[in-house]
Amino acid sequence: MAPRSKSAKAEDRLSALRHNPSTRVLIIGGGINGIATFRDLALQGTPVTLVERSDFCSGASAASSHMIHGGVRYLENGELRLVKESLMERNRLLASAPHYVRPLKTTIPIFSLVSGLFAAPIRLFTHAQGKPKERGALLIKVGLMMYDLFGRNQGKMPRHSFLGRQKSLAEMPHMNPDIRFTATYYDAAMDNPERLALDVLRDGVEAGDHAQAFNYVSAVGWESEGVVLRDELSGETFTVAADVVVNTSGPWTDLTNEALGQPTNYMGGTKGSHIVLDNPTLFEACDGREIFFENSDGRIVLMYPIMNRVLVGTTDTPVDMRDEIVCTDEEVEYFFDLVSR
């Protein structure tokens, strides 16, 4: 395999930055947050430079659940403003990027009527983050009514529905026969988040020469003149002065701040792993929808069809962000155990 190399045009642009090393805003991190910030500033005519140490959108933005999540599970913690904002942004993406973002029918299997109903008000008003109890039909009904209410004026998604055990099993015969109800609502998903991110990036780059984006360039230090950048292909370092530096490194935010001489402890250091299964039986059992439920250990579990396969997730495991982040054999076995139930 031939080593990576920059195109002549990209090398010319980077050379121009070395010879005129200043910008109004320097954005560090080319995931979706960095790219979206870059686009917004570029379209406003602000001189802006974006740097990414690897491929654009190659980190957490690509290794996600591929959902455009309206935030239904945050209702129980009283994060109502977050849910309203998430629904608004979800519906905007459904309208503006229907070639990438699609409605996702989501079904919740329910095994009790009132479980969690009395603990929920405490969590709602105290914003407590403790391990939740199993959610029964009444609690889920209240939550989905609120979810429909918050999203009613922002899109045309169908309202939620409930089915009893008999109708649920007739519709989805592979479902656990111990269920008492199923609740179905709509969220959204996207098969290729990287493609949407590149479209957003292109909007910014095409705004004019005042907006420059470079991959395989990392922020490695700080000097009085500005941020020290390193060309990851040549190893050359140079310093860029900026009026404002925006750190959009995602899970690596603290490591970037440390490199810039400003140690922080903002990020929790956890990972959520997923696997993608080529299993026709499971694909058929999903019936074109997401199955969304809570495991006995308190973790949220999701599985849904994606590109003729089935995505299953997710874990919540502490990690050191200096290490390579991978899905371990133990996590794979955990997912297999979930699917086999």
Predicted regions and their residues:
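Active-site substrate-recognition segment that forms the wall
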Residues: 40-43, 47, 51, 99-106, ...
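N-terminal Rossmann-fold NAD(P) dinucleotide-binding loop
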Residues: 34
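Helix-loop-beta segment of a Rossmann-like dinucleotide-binding subdomain
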Residues: 22, 126-133, 149-159, 169-211, ...
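Dinucleotide-binding Rossmann-like beta1-alpha1 core, especially the glycine-rich loop
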Residues: 66-169
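A conserved short coil-to-beta-strand element within the FAD-binding core of flavoproteins
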Residues: 215-227
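Extreme N-terminal leader/targeting segments of oxidoreductases
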Residues: 1-25, 40-44
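Glycine-rich Rossmann-fold phosphate-binding loop(s) that bind the pyrophosphate
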Residues: 29-31, 53
